[in-house]
């Protein structure tokens, strides 16, 4: 124990002094100090053990020989093991895509081998492509190789219309061109300076799935999903699952907050796969010839909802941990499934734990149009709508023209976007 100035003592000498320098009044009993020190040491030991385990795993992976393309292909499911795979006719091709395909074929060698296709599934980097004549696995052409430094956003994604070459007598094809995307649902992920990842392309609507019955609905996640959907020109639909887990009062409270957050123009559907509630409403949001993407974190009930819409268990489902209601990843591939009857196609992707917003100003403006419109009358062009004089947005809030929950959410998202942009480029000042 070392006495510091005044009536405080400082504990140091641990593995990371800056993290464990604790200051408390001298009146604390000795047993309290011992408990605090023991807890700090245990936390440090746990961190060290976890870091060592991660380092050992990285070393093991570095020494193992990478799997060959043949080994990876052998590990993906065969077509005979898949159900509800969309046909080529389920995914319409627009005029711009067809014109781009014709132009590419006119310049390609052996154009008779080229086919117009749609990527309906992605397993371990191997797309499953549906064409007018067949459905088969394909690989990327050399021009798509990531080792050359291309952005991942250029790689074929689920929902892409592609020009694929398939030589006579070959089981696999080669994707040589990704045709223009009508819409593209992208997110930023990983790496120090970020990387764009296309989760699905050519989508018409996004089903924002959020579970009920686990405390308050995660409004921040719903808001981020709303911004991402509107940014890519897709129609957002909020789907609240597991309604059977909450009582009437909880449901009314959560519904009120969600409606306040998303505004009157966004549809909100309450569902329960166990009771069959709301399934027809969700199905009506995906008419024949359209494509919807289902978006939600692990444990939100995406796969369970899809199985209920399909009428049988096609996708694997998993439980959630009771202590924090967090789910485990059960969807490990990006897949499309065709709904039965007069309905369209739904794309499913692994649950996303984070939804960073970078460069989604257009989506933010579309999600909160009344705030953007009111901000045009603010005295200062860079008004943050928090403390500046002459803020027209706060005046509109006081007058009841802007919901306080929507304004608070808008401010949080705008601040998050500024921080994310500066992380990608420290020279950016917003």
Protein language model annotation of sequence segments:
Residues 21, 28-88, 110-113, 150-161, ...:
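Helix-rich effector regions associated with P-loop NTPase G domains
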Residues 112-123:
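Structural detector for short beta-strands of small beta-barrel domains
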Residues 135-152:
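Beta-strand/loop nucleic-acid-binding surfaces
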Residues 179-182, 203-220, 244-248:
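Conserved Switch II/interswitch segment of TRAFAC-class P-loop GTPases
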Residues 203-210, 233-241, 265-270:
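Conserved beta-strand/loop subsegment of P-loop NTPase cores
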Residues 246-298:
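Canonical P-loop GTPase G-domain recognition
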Residues 301:
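Conserved glycine(s) of the Walker
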Residues 304-314:
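A conserved segment at the C-terminal end of the G1
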């Amino acid at each position: 124990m070392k006495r510091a100035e005044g009536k405080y003592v400082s504990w140091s000498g641990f593995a990371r002094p800056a993290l464990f320098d604790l200051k408390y009044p001298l009146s604390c009993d000795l047993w309290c100090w011992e408990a605090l020190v023991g807890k700090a040491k245990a936390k440090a030991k746990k961190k060290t053990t976890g870091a060592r385990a991660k380092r050992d795993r990285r070393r093991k992976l570095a020494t193992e020989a990478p799997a060959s393309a043949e080994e990876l292909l052998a590990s993906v499911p065969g077509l005979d093991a898949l159900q509800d795979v969309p046909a080529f006719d389920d995914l319409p091709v627009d005029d711009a895509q067809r014109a781009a395909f014709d132009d590419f074929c006119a310049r390609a060698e052996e154009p008779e081998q080229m086919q117009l296709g749609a990527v309906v599934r992605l397993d371990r980097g191997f797309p499953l492509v549906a064409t007018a004549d067949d459905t088969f696995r394909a690989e990327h052409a050399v021009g798509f190789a990531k080792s050359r430094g291309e952005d991942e956003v250029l790689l074929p994604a689920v929902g892409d219309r592609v020009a694929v070459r398939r030589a006579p007598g070959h089981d696999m094809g080669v994707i040589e061109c990704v045709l223009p995307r009508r819409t593209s649902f992208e997110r930023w992920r990983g790496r120090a300076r970020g990387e764009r990842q296309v989760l699905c392309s050519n989508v018409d609507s996004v089903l924002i799935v959020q579970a009920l019955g686990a405390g308050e609905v995660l409004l921040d996640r719903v808001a981020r999903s709303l911004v991402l959907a509107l940014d890519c020109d897709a129609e957002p639909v909020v789907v609240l699952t597991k309604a059977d887990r909450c009582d009437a009062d909880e449901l009314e409270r959560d519904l009120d907050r969600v409606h306040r957050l998303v505004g009157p123009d966004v549809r909100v559907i309450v569902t329960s796969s166990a009771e069959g509630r709301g399934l027809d409403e969700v199905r009506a949001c995906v008419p024949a010839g359209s494509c919807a993407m289902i978006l939600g974190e692990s444990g939100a009930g995406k796969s369970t909802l899809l199985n209920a819409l399909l009428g049988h268990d096609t996708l694997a489902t998993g439980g959630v941990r009771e202590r924090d209601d967090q789910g485990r990843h059960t969807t490990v591939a990006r897949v499309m499934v065709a709904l039965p009857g007069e309905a369209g196609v739904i794309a499913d992707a692994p649950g996303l734990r984070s939804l960073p917003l970078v460069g989604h100003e257009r989506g933010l403006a579309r999600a909160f149009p009344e705030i953007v419109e009111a901000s045009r009358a603010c005295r200062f062009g860079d008004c943050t709508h928090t403390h500046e004089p002459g803020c027209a947005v706060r005046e509109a809030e006081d007058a009841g023209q802007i919901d306080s929950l929507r304004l608070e959410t808008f401010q949080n998202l705008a601040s998050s976007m500024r921080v994310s942009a500066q992380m990608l480029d420290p020279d950016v000042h917003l």
